[in-house]
């Protein structure tokens, strides 16, 4: 009997995408035996309204450049093609239509986001449509996160998991700040992404792209 398709969904602004994202996606893919991981650059995320987000075209192309050599990785424009704010519930519903109801979806997110899942739009419905995988790093204080995981499991069953991934102290915020200050970003992200940032002069102090 053929098993159901298992797809990982990795959403994020990817501003820019870096090795931390890629290592996390690969670790979760291996742990849950996913057929592929689909990276979904956010279009107009409601939780990022406090800072200026780089143009979605640049973020989408950088994500393609970063993932193109991995046959298990794919990039979707499903959110950047959508008008207005982009919500996870709408994205999962669209993927359900594309891949069928029998497909199992695993939404990959940072452990800190677990603390906010129940506040997401239509969280109740969302937690019934897909599994959640919270990626944590070794040494991270996890009591608060574990408590939230237990709370969600009591309400919805085994729909959320925690996976410890190799620790990489890399963040998109740090990369943007380093570029703005003229500091090197080599070994923090794939070379094609670094060249793209240089070519289009992204993350400069006066960047208006």
UniProtKB/Swiss-Prot annotation:
Pfam families: CTP_transf_like
Gene Ontology molecular function, alphabetical: ATP binding; nicotinate-nucleotide adenylyltransferase activity
Pathway in which this enzyme or protein is active: Cofactor biosynthesis; NAD(+) biosynthesis; deamido-NAD(+) from nicotinate D-ribonucleotide: step 1/1
Domain of life according to the entry: Bacteria
Coiled-coil regions listed in the entry: none
Keyword Transferase: yes
EC nos: 2.7.7.18
Protein known as: Probable nicotinate-nucleotide adenylyltransferase
Species per Swiss-Prot/TrEMBL record: Caldanaerobacter subterraneus subsp. tengcongensis (strain DSM 15242 / JCM 11007 / NBRC 100824 / MB4) (Thermoanaerobacter tengcongensis)
GN (gene name): nadD
């Amino acid at each position: 009997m053929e098993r159901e398709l298992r797809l990982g969904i990795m959403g994020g602004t990817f501003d820019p995408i870096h090795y931390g994202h890629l290592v996390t996606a690969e670790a979760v893919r291996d742990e849950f035996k996913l057929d592929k991981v689909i990276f979904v650059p956010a279009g107009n995320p409601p939780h990022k309204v406090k800072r200026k987000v780089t143009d979605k075209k640049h973020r989408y192309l950088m994500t393609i450049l970063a993932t193109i050599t991995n046959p298990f990785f794919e990039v979707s424009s499903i959110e950047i093609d959508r008008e207005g704010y982009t919500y996870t519930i709408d994205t999962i519903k669209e993927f359900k239509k594309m891949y069928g109801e029998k497909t199992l979806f695993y939404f990959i997110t940072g452990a800190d986001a677990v603390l906010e899942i129940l506040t997401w739009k239509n969280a109740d419905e969302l937690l019934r449509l897909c599994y959640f995988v919270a990626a944590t790093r070794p040494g991270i204080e996890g009591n608060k996160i574990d408590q939230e995981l237990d709370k969600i499991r009591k309400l919805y069953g085994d729909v959320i998991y925690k996976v410890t991934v190799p620790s990489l102290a890399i963040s998109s915020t740090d990369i943007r700040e380093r570029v703005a200050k003229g500091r090197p970003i080599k070994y923090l992200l794939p070379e094609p992404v670094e060249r793209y940032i240089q070519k289009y002069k992204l993350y400069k102090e006066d960047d208006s792209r």
